[in-house]
Amino acid sequence: QRVPWQGHTTRYAVPAIYEEIKRHGTTLLFVNTRSQAELLFQELWRINDETLPIALHHGSLDAGQRRKVEAAMARNALRAVVATSTLDLGIDWGDIDLVIHVGAPKGASRLAQRIGRANHRMDEPSRAILVPSNRFEVLECEAAIEASDEGAQDTPPGGEGALDVLSQHVLGVACAAPFDADELFAEVRS
């Protein structure tokens, strides 16, 4: 089915996503928002005729529920997990065979991080599929893939003398209590 001009549910691709889940051992599906996670999980569950164990993981779920999903992942008891950025970092789930990113990844760094969740075996590369939600996201997905292939990172490099940190510090000092401007200037210069 063709990618629609608008929308963010990716409903058009759910049957193909389900087929990929059936073909792989464990699939991690990343989405950008909680509502996308809920909708995708619901759509996958609706067509889950084989009753594959599919779970949901995002920040609005009860911490106990998230821990249950994480424990099931650690036991290799799940075939798929639909997740937001809550599973971007942290524990490496070595038995994840495939990452599917639903919607544009919103940057090469995020894409690389999410692809890195899959396949920590030495003899095989990580596998990922990008599923744009609409035709405009096709371009974003292509740009993120190209940037990732080139090793480009879209996160600004940290550096000495970051002005945003300085401004936050000065604002914090100013809001906390009376201060001596000369002392603050000397602190900043040190």
At which residue positions do the language-model features occur?
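Helicase motor core with emphasis on the C-terminal RecA-like subdomain
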Residues: Q1-A176, A181-S190
